[in-house]
Amino acid sequence: MAATGTAAAAATGRLLLLLLVGLTAPALALAGYIEALAANAGTGFAVAEPQIAMFCGKLNMHVNIQTGKWEPDPTGTKSCFETKEEVLQYCQEMYPELQITNVMEANQRVSIDNWCRRDKKQCKSRFVTPFKCLVGEFVSDVLLVPEKCQFFHKERMEVCENHQHWHTVVKEACLTQGMTLYSYGMLLPCGVDQFHGTEYVCCPQTKIIGSVSKEEEEEDEEEEEEEDEEEDYDVYKSEFPTEADLEDFTEAAVDEDDEDEEEGEEVVEDRDYYYDTFKGDDYNEENPTEPGSDGTMSDKEITHDVKAVCSQEAMTGPCRAVMPRWYFDLSKGKCVRFIYGGCGGNRNNFESEDYCMAVCKAMIPPTPLPTNDVDVYFETSADDNEHARFQKAKEQLEIRHRNRMDRVKKEWEEAELQAKNLPKAERQTLIQHFQAMVKALEKEAASEKQQLVETHLARVEAMLNDRRRMALENYLAALQSDPPRPHRILQALRRYVRAENKDRLHTIRHYQHVLAVDPEKAAQMKSQVMTHLHVIEERRNQSLSLLYKVPYVAQEIQEEIDELLQEQRADMDQFTASISETPVDVRVSSEESEEIPPFHPFHPFPALPENEDTQPELYHPMKKGSGVGEQDGGLIGAEEKVINSKNKVDENMVIDETLDVKEMIFNAERVGGLEEERESVGPLREDFSLSSSALIGLLVIAVAIATVIVISLVMLRKRQYGTISHGIVEVDPMLTPEERHLNKMQNHGYENPTYKYLEQMQI
């Protein structure tokens, strides 16, 4: 009988254990944290997470994880710390049985009862923000998302900030969306109480703010007077009590009770809490409480309090400490640094500029919002909807110009009716007046259109460059991965080729549009367009040739590469055929016919011979000059030098508004350098022989002639295109064209990611 009972009890225990495991499965993060606490505690099961609390002048407090109660410092000597590292060390001392790895400031303040001063028996309650002692590996908090609320997260690996900074960031993020912060947590620790990001929940704002009633405030004041006139804490309650909706404005008051008992002044904290509005209208009652009927505070009253705080002058106070702080300067409309003495002062006293601006930003006059699509376009930065916003702005500009012209036309007609009986000379003067008005309007419209187009082209150019640069860096990173993954390399290569193709297609569309609208201008820019396309082609081929470093991967994805290049080649062949029908420069046309051969599959790595030291014929150009980096700088970096040297779009530049991409600007030195590069590579492919001295002489003469031609064009056309800043470089006639081109690019400070990759491979 006893055995049967024991078996039944064991079965029941196993069933309860399985049920418990099933219920706790969705909360793996919390279970893992409790597991870590239980494993490290050694004695008993932890019912609370380890925390410590500090208040200058009082003994440090820590939570007993077995009882959940606050206990004073066991040594009876330690008080507040100055650095987070000291806080971490104290956590490790208080919880030696736990593996404390970091500390983090809590989101909410807590009230600690019977908190005694150091070396005294005065014990009072105190509100304070504790520090959490994090156990083991960092686990982010689990955030609940109520109905009609939204979850967000921010991660910036280049930023490593403390808890207070991210709190300010998420508050601002919620406010910009017309919502208020509900809860938040830290992500990705990068130091002691420092993190790379945060996650947070925003909820709709409410119109009525619940607060402590007047009667409760009076009772609190009476109780505080009985407790030696302790500081008054006005806590405005929220319908969502999980958010730390109480913010401190300053730490600046002297505890008057202790002045009579102690010889020196002891600085304590005067927490003045600021209320953050929360929740949506759906949380209100059917009959919302009327402001003022039960002591509630409205948004208007909160704004009045903020104005009263932020309009105060900065006060150092009577103490002589040196504490850098921030205050809001009403005359300047921004937060300014000042030195706080450590006591006294007023509430216009903040620990950081971000915190100061977050509280006092209501004091800054709002910037007038743009009234039409044109102003909106100029006021906002580029994004994925750049083209659509540009089209709207262009249409708005045309409507504005048309309305102005209609108004002038109407005035002109009315003036003609009234001037029928005037002498001919006066009528002629009237006509000239309105003609001048029309001409001025046309000129103004052309100027506005030019500014709009230049802005659009600059933004598109920047977007194309950024996308290509990111795609190339990802491709190089995939090649450097150990071991290389063919699928990942192919995926990164596709993105890179697609980015290059977008640049190429925009350039082609640009030229085709100019050719249809202004053939003369198209003839002038033809060589520039073809040079730009050649640079794109060479840069892409050189990037593809990097696959030689991992030949077995390249052989595996060879077919996919051929298909990818065939798609790109089809559009290029069509454009080459169309552009060859309107030859402008015989030399350029013949060059392009040689530079763009019919499509053939890309094979950068033939079957490797038995001698692994022998490299494919494709890499012969890399043996010239100063090594691998020259081809890298000459091909991949050629376009980057021109783009990076264009600091801004020239204001005198006239471009049609329908263009979708930049017009590349190459001066004679730039074009000459590229032509020298092509002519220097030619002998390697075609095997014709020229003496090096004759070749150098011809190249120098060509560069001189091209320079004279370009200078003449600049003087005639007043340099309509954006200027490119080139330093004065002494050209050594004994250098090869590749070396001269590399020197020019290095003088401009350019260094591309492929060069770094090849340099690392050599090391």
Curated annotation (Swiss-Prot):
Site features described as Required for Cu(2+) reduction, chain residue numbers: 186
Positions of glycan attachment: 626
Main location: membrane
Keyword terms of this UniProt record: Cell membrane, Copper, Disulfide bond, DNA-binding, Glycoprotein, Membrane, Metal-binding, Nucleus, Phosphoprotein, Protease inhibitor, Proteoglycan, Serine protease inhibitor, Signal, Transmembrane, Transmembrane helix
Membrane topology (Cytoplasmic): 717-763
A Gene Ontology cellular-component term: nucleus
Post-translational modification note: The BPTI/Kunitz inhibitor domain is O-glycosylated.
Gene3D superfamilies given in the database record: 6.10.250.1670, Amyloid precursor protein, E2 domain, Amyloidogenic glycoprotein, copper-binding domain, Amyloidogenic glycoprotein, heparin-binding domain, Pancreatic trypsin inhibitor Kunitz domain, Pleckstrin-homology domain (PH domain)/Phosphotyrosine-binding domain (PTB)
GO biological process: axonogenesis; central nervous system development; G protein-coupled receptor signaling pathway
Chain positions covered by the region annotation GFLD subdomain: 46-139
E2 domain segment(s): 373-564
Span of domain E1: 46-205
GO MF terms held by the record: DNA binding; heparin binding; identical protein binding; serine-type endopeptidase inhibitor activity; transition metal ion binding
Subcellular location: Cell membrane; Nucleus
Renumbered residue ranges of the record's region Interaction with DAB2: 749-763
Residue numbers covered by motif NPXY motif: 750-755
UniProt cross-references to PANTHER family, sorted A to Z: ALZHEIMER'S DISEASE BETA-AMYLOID RELATED (PTHR23103), AMYLOID BETA PRECURSOR LIKE PROTEIN 2 (PTHR23103:SF14)
Protein name: Amyloid beta precursor like protein 2
Annotated organism of origin: Homo sapiens
Native organism taxonomy: Eukaryota, Metazoa, Chordata, Craniata, Vertebrata
Record gene name: APLP2
